[in-house]
Every structure is written in structure tokens, then in C-alpha cells.
Amino acid sequence: MLRRLHPDQPDTFTFAPANHAWAEAQITKFPEGRQASAVIPLLWRAQEQEGWLTRPALECVAEMLGMAYIRVLEVATFYFMFQLQPVGRIAHFQVCGTTSCLICGAEDLISVCKEKIASEPHDISQNGKFSWEEVECLGACANAPMVQIGKDYYEDLTTEKFSDLIDEFDNGNVPIPGPQNGRYAAEPEGGLTSLKAYTKSATIYNASAQTAVDLNDTVKRIDGTEVPLLTPWLSKIKKSKKMLPKT
């Protein structure tokens, strides 16, 4: 499927200061001359800041990484996780429509999107808050049907729960990601039948949802100040340099 940039583009893009610091930190993960390896995380952060990727954002990332603009454009147009047109300012719902989710009710979730958001995918709701699209498998087949918002999964949905989810976002709340039917992760609905000792050390939510809660790393991120700048690899780099033999 051919993907192009949206015809209406802003004049400029600038990373917010905290996001710029985060981006510069990501670049240090890679050896000199390999900065292009940071292209996906930088594009993702630009999208988290703006909601979608604009041409000026691609140009900014290309300049930061010393890449030709066309190379960054190739990445952005190849991966469907990158939005190339405006989306709802609160949430863009990606509804998985592949086999497991389809069998378990994805079409019903799409009907909810058409009723409560917009009749066509990628159209923005009248209040400007939401948009939606159907996507291919998101790898949460054991928790079908589900939707993705940014990097958060909302799983084990019914039409009622999904409708309530949209209402929660509309009211300014951010529902906790993960299973929405009371399941911890992807265990059988009746509960674990083996490896039960694991539950003794379990966190309140499963690992991905717990991380989102602990770091306040949710769909509400805008400028990067909402979460701490974590760069554990820098201390390892400094330690390894100290261990190098002197010449």
C-alpha cells in the first residue's frame, strides 16, 4: 500500500526541550557513525509529541541523525505505526481486525468507532478529540478483541467496555491499559492452573501496564516532562571506558 505525506503541512517542527534532551540521549546508545540507528525512536517521540509525523518533523530527525531526508521518509512511510496525517488530539484508536480479534468481535468494535467517532477511518471526530483505523495483527491474540492507542494496549474488550473507554477519554480521564475484563495478563479466564507461585510476587497490573502507571507514561504525554529521562546505558559506557587499557 502506497503511503504519502498529508498535503497540508505545518511550516516548522521543533522538539519540546525535554523531548529534545530525550532524543539526544537516545543517539548516545549507538557508536559514532551509527546514529541513524536511532531513527525509529526519534520518529516515535516526534509522533508522541504531535500525534502524527509532519514533513518538518522528518526533516528535523534527518538533521539530528545526519541522514538524507529520503531515508527518514522511507522509514516513516514503511511502518504503519507512524501516522502520516492528523489524528484526534486525545486518542487515535487502532482496532485490530485480524483473525483472532475478528472472531471475537472486532467488527463490533469498528461499529462503535463509526457510531461514536467518525463513519470513515482516519476521519477526525466532530469535537476533534478522536480518530480511528483498522489495523493488522497487534500480537495480543490471547486477549482479543483489542485496540491500541499509541503504545498502550486495551484488551479483552466488549462493545460496552469499548464505548465506556471512549467516554472515559472524552471526560478527560486515562483508563489504565491492559485487559479490561479483570484478567491480569493472558491467563485462562478461570485463572492459572499451573505456575501459581508467580502470583505471590505479582504487581498490581501486568508488566507493561504497571510500567505505564509507575512512570505516568500514558497517551497523555505531550512534551516529555511527564516522564523521567532514563539513560542507564550511559553509566555502563563510562564504566567500560574506564576498564580499557591505557595506551
Predicted regions and their residues:
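Signature of N-terminal electron-transfer/Fe-S-associated modules in redox systems
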Residues: 1-247
